Amino acid sequence: MLEILKKSLKKAPIVKRGKYPYFIHPITDGVPAIDPKLLDEISDYIIEYSDMDVDRILSIEAMGIPLATAISLKTGIPFSIVRKRQYQLPGEIKISQSTGYSKGELYINGIEKGNRILLVDDVISTGGTLRFLVKALEEKGVTISDIIVIVGRGDGVQQLAGEGIRVKTLVDINVSEDGVSILEDTGETN
């Protein structure tokens, strides 16, 4: 299962960002090109194993856009994107967030109180972005049916679980200067 994703992750190039080994992958970075077969495999898996009884799919720019698009096209469920730009539309939700890698503001439009959503993201490391996003959505009165993240790296899933936020990952990885390794399925996050 998810063989295209796993194979592509194992082949992902590693670059250094300071002391941090960073993997580059089409699903998490948009480069090199995103293979439609990869998106097809991922979206099929998400549709099969997620609670799809939702009003909306919600994902985070930029790399959440192709994921949400693929799922939306297959299910007919509309999607909204959490943006880094403010639009000042009525009902816009502003989130101030700080993670291990960045800080700033995010904006959600097209989500209303009482909506039931599927939240999809490309990668989780520290869990910071999802933590702030989930809190903002819950305060708005939105129900989150599932939180699905394609690639799990680091301890973000465990940190969020300790706060009562359940995140499902498709693949958990370890990244070193030698490359990406796929961690065995523990059943805890998948």
Swiss-Prot record:
This is Hypoxanthine/guanine phosphoribosyltransferase. Disulfide bonds: none annotated. Its EC number is 2.4.2.8. Pfam families: Pribosyltran (PF00156). Catalyzes a salvage reaction resulting in the formation of IMP that is energically less costly than de novo synthesis. GO terms for molecular function: guanine phosphoribosyltransferase activity; hypoxanthine phosphoribosyltransferase activity. Belongs to the purine/pyrimidine phosphoribosyltransferase family. Archaeal HPRT subfamily. Homodimer. It catalyses: IMP + diphosphate = hypoxanthine + 5-phospho-alpha-D-ribose 1-diphosphate; GMP + diphosphate = guanine + 5-phospho-alpha-D-ribose 1-diphosphate.
